């Protein structure tokens, strides 16, 4: 956001604000649906820029919107440049949006992000609601991320976790050793996702940071994508700037990153096409996701997207959704356990009780590790994958909580605020995995419907949630089973968050690791 406000746009705005004020005026609602109350709206909107001037600081947008909700209520309207935007953070509004009005609110906004990083909105995450989106969503759910497909790829993430554990044991060996564990989590999740997508892994865990940066250009690109995905492109909210050919630093960076990404993923697709043409792949060989997409995705003349473009768009989508988000969640789990050592001890005792100390944990064991599952759920409550949802757009006029919402209104769900609502959660700022365990000692899956949304809700809910939680559970379980974790002497665990799309930990997480099981279990 700072990069947006730091541009010399203010000069342009000062000159144009009087002449072009009428362009900014709120569009009149259609006469056929003028029912309902007027939405609470923030004060101090300015011509052309709306309320953008209230967002220009280092506070994450979800937290800024939460402070607005404290003043205006859990459903309010803010104007982002030329566009009215609805922000909701209570379960009643969320239920109405994603049940009664789910279809109306299932579309995405047209954006520079979708054009450049989504290959002109060709991925399932950013395509507008309609026939093309439904087609790609079906392919994703049935072919790429179905329970059958995830199970067929289980060997990928289990073998990668085995490799990480082995290399960690070589690094730690005996005694306490300081490890920047957040970097290991990043390499783990990126190796898993690229191996699933294209059959390649990019890192050995014992590489130093300089080697990673030199050899892992794709990782650097993904990090840049995650950063700029949380930034506004000026012309997306003030269209007049596009007419004058204005390009800010965010747009310039986005164009560069999209070119570099296309070169990498385009090469992956070409390699798979060549192998297929040469008859290298056969029905008995384990297929990666590019193989699958090449076999099920076709050109789509109606949307103007050819097969390879659709595949590349969804490769990028899968990498963004499956790498940085998962490693961030695992890092926050370890942060919270280090700050709550009794919870870490209880989790280790649960594992020792059910698995023992003479064999490694298998995926089939996770169902018996109730407290571990509760730890993951509680971490996702405090640190949801997307604290602020990717914006939706209303395709028709509708009513939400008695308020009139006109067609074209954009919608944010403030998950961060919802998950810390004191009317829902007892001591919402406290880390308490027990809140997700019912009186029978089982995970409570029923009590928090429309109150707990770590992976979204409705038609646009994250299709990869099952895969992500499986990886998180087994990786964290293996780590805390095999190692004791401590904070380095004279250090505290810094809880500061970044300001990007997923609010990752601002500083790397350093821990002291000590092996706790027989040597052969690390091999």
UniProtKB/Swiss-Prot annotation:
It holds the Pfam family p450. The chain crosses the membrane at residues 4-24. Pathway: Steroid metabolism; cholesterol metabolism. It is found in: Membrane. SUPFAM superfamilies: Cytochrome P450. Disulfide bonds: none annotated. It comes from the Eukaryota. Mainly expressed in leaves and seed pods and, to a lower extent, in flowers and stems. Its EC number is 1.14.14.-. The coexpression of CYP90B50 and CYP82J17 in the yeast strain RH6829, which was engineered to accumulate cholesterol, leads to the production of diosgenin, the main precursor for the industrial production of steroid hormones. Keywords: Cholesterol metabolism, Heme, Iron, Lipid biosynthesis, Lipid metabolism, Membrane, Metal-binding, Monooxygenase, Oxidoreductase, Steroid biosynthesis, Steroid metabolism, Sterol metabolism, Transmembrane, Transmembrane helix. GO terms for cellular component: membrane. One of its GO terms (biological process) is steroid biosynthetic process. Heme binds at residue 462. Its main location: membrane. One of its GO terms (molecular function) is iron ion binding. It is a single-pass membrane protein. Belongs to the cytochrome P450 family. Involved in the biosynthesis of spiroketal steroid and saponin natural products from cholesterol such as diosgenin and analogs (e.g. furostanol and spirostanol), plant defense compounds used as main precursors for the industrial production of steroid hormones. During the 5,6-spiroketalization of cholesterol, may catalyze the 27-monohydroxylation of furostanol-type steroid to an intermediate product that undergoes a stereospecific formation of the terminal heterocycle to yield diosgenin. This is Cytochrome P450 CYP82J17. It comes from Trigonella foenum-graecum (Fenugreek). The lineage of its organism: Eukaryota, Viridiplantae, Streptophyta, Embryophyta, Tracheophyta.
């Amino acid at each position: 956001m700072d990069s947006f406000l730091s541009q010399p746009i203010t000069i342009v705005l000062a000159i144009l604000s009087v002449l072009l004020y009428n362009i900014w005026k709120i569009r009149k609602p259609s006469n056929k649906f003028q029912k309902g109350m007027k939405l609470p709206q923030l004060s101090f909107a300015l011509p052309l820029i709306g309320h953008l001037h209230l967002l220009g600081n280092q506070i994450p947008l979800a937290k800024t919107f939460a402070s607005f909700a404290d003043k205006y209520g859990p459903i309010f309207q803010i104007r982002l440049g030329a566009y009215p935007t609805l922000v909701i953070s209570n379960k009643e509004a969320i239920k109405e949006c994603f049940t009664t009005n789910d279809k109306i609110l299932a579309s995405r906004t047209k954006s520079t992000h979708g054009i450049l990083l989504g290959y002109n909105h060709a991925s399932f995450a950013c395509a507008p609601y309609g026939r093309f989106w439904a087609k790609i969503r079906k392919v994703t759910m049935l072919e790429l991320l179905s329970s059958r497909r995830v199970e067929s790829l289980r060997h990928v993430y289990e073998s990668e976790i085995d490799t990480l554990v082995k290399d960690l044991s070589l690094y730690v060996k005996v005694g306490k050793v300081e490890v920047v564990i957040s970097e290991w989590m990043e390499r783990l999740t990126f190796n898993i996702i690229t191996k699933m997508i294209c059959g390649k892994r990019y890192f050995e865990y014992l590489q130093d940071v300089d080697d990673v940066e030199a050899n892992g250009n794709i990782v650097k690109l993904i990090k840049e994508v995650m950063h700029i995905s949380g930034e506004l492109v000026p012309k997306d909210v003030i269209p007049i700037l596009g007419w004058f050919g204005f390009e800010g630093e965010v747009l310039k960076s986005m164009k560069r990153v999209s070119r570099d990404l296309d070169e990498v993923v385009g090469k992956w697709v070409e390699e798979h096409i060549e192998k297929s043409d040469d008859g290298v792949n056969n029905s008995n060989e384990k297929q990666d996701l590019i193989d699958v997409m090449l076999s099920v995705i076709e050109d789509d003349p109606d949307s103007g997207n050819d097969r390879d473009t659709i595949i590349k768009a969804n490769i990028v989508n899968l990498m963004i959704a499956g790498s940085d988000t998962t490693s961030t969640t695992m890092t926050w789990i370890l942060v919270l356990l280090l700050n709550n050592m009794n919870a870490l001890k209880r989790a280790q005792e649960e594992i020792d009780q059910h698995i023992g100390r003479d064999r490694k944990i298998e995926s089939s064991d996770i169902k018996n590790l109730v407290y571990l599952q509760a730890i993951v759920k509680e971490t996702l409550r405090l640190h949801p994958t997307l604290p602020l949802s990717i914006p939706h757009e209303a395709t028709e006029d509708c009513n939400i909580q008695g308020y009139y919402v006109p067609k074209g209104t954009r919608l944010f769900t403030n998950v961060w605020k919802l998950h810390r609502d004191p009317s829902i959660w007892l001591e919402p700022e406290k880390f308490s995995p027990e809140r997700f365990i019912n009186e029978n000692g089982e995970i409570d899956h029923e009590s928090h419907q429309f109150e707990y949304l770590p992976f979204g809700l409705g038609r646009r809910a994250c299709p990869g949630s099952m895969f992500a939680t499986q990886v998180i559970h087994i990786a964290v379980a293996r780590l805390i089973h095999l190692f004791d974790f401590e904070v380095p002497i004279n250090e505290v665990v810094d809880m500061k968050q970044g300001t990007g799309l997923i609010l990752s930990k601002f500083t790397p997480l350093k821990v002291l690791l000590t092996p706790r099981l027989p040597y052969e279990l690390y091999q």
